[in-house]
Amino acid sequence: MPWLQLKAHIAPQHAETLEDLLLAEGAQVITLQDAHDDPVFEPESGTTPLWNETVLTGLYDDLEDIEPMLERVRQQWAAEMADEPCPEIDYELVADRDWEREWMDDFAPLKMGERLWVVPSWHEAPEPGAVNLLLDPGLAFGTGTHPTTALCLAWLDGLDLDASRVLDFGCGSGILAIAALKLGARHATGTDIDPQALQASRDNAQRNDVADEHLSLCYPERLADERHDVVVANILAGPLVELAPTLCAHLAPGGRLALSGILAGQAEEVMDAYREQGMLLDAPVEREGWVRITGKAPA
């Protein structure tokens, strides 16, 4: 059965409004993608992706009355958005395909550093003897596909984590905490403001045979007043600046720090905030416009 596909180019801050209108008119699925093919796969829960222009695509299985439906969408948009013009919505018929299989085919195992692989559940591990982290790709939380997550994973892979205690602040899927444990850490703590993130971390820990006694998960306000050998935070530049005193307070003397979720143009502001806390910082590492900042606490 063919599908009716609608597509519109829209400013990111207005994408949710159009998405809601199309869903109300029976869209089976809505997807959002960067218009310039540089997607942010891991936005914080409840936030808008950091794109200049978004391509919104909707699929419908009802092929009749498309023009009346679009007219209703335009009228409702005008009622809700005042002077903001409704974006142009194009449509076409597309052949029926195995959408789930095509989505799965887009994701292959990813190697992070020298030892670590992130492996989707439907793939065989390319190197069974390597450190294999089983994690399926998703949009809400880190899965290794985004440069910021990849930068943090590669950094962890390069550390000697044997018997260390690790804090993953803003843990999302738990990917960084779980990776640290599989790379030799004695204990990891993951903290996040989103209960869905904490649940995702629990689920992924179980999938990777992480014992409960090696991983603690909590909200930030319940974080124990203790120091860690390694602190990693892959969030956003603004919160990282605000959290500088907190994150540094959780570092043991000589402990290692990694920060990401930072656009290249924001790096200096973030680095200044951590220099003020006495951190000894390395040169930032950039990938696809995003940077990782690492450093060491004074001994």
From Swiss-Prot:
Gene for this chain: prmA
Q: Superkingdom of the source?
A: Bacteria
Kindly list any coiled-coil regions of this protein: none
Subcellular location, record wording = Cytoplasm
Q: List the disulfide bonds.
A: none
State which Enzyme Commission number(s) the record gives: 2.1.1.-
UniProt keyword list: Cytoplasm, Methyltransferase, S-adenosyl-L-methionine, Transferase
Q: Which reaction does it catalyse?
A: L-lysyl-[protein] + 3 S-adenosyl-L-methionine = N(6),N(6),N(6)-trimethyl-L-lysyl-[protein] + 3 S-adenosyl-L-homocysteine + 3 H(+)
UniProt cross-references to Pfam families, sorted A to Z? PrmA
Q: Which organism is it from?
A: Chromohalobacter salexigens (strain ATCC BAA-138 / DSM 3043 / CIP 106854 / NCIMB 13768 / 1H11)
Give the family this protein belongs to, as stated in its UniProt record: Belongs to the methyltransferase superfamily. PrmA family.
Establish whether keyword Transmembrane helix is in the entry: no
Residues the entry annotates as binding S-adenosyl-L-methionine:
149, 170, 192, 234
What Gene Ontology terms for biological process does this UniProt record contain? methylation
Entry's Gene Ontology cellular component terms: cytosol
What does this protein's UniProt record list under function? Answer: Methylates ribosomal protein L11.
Q: Report the NCBIfam families cross-referenced here.
A: prmA
Cite the GO molecular-function annotations of the record.
protein-lysine N-methyltransferase activity
Q: What is this protein called?
A: Ribosomal protein L11 methyltransferase
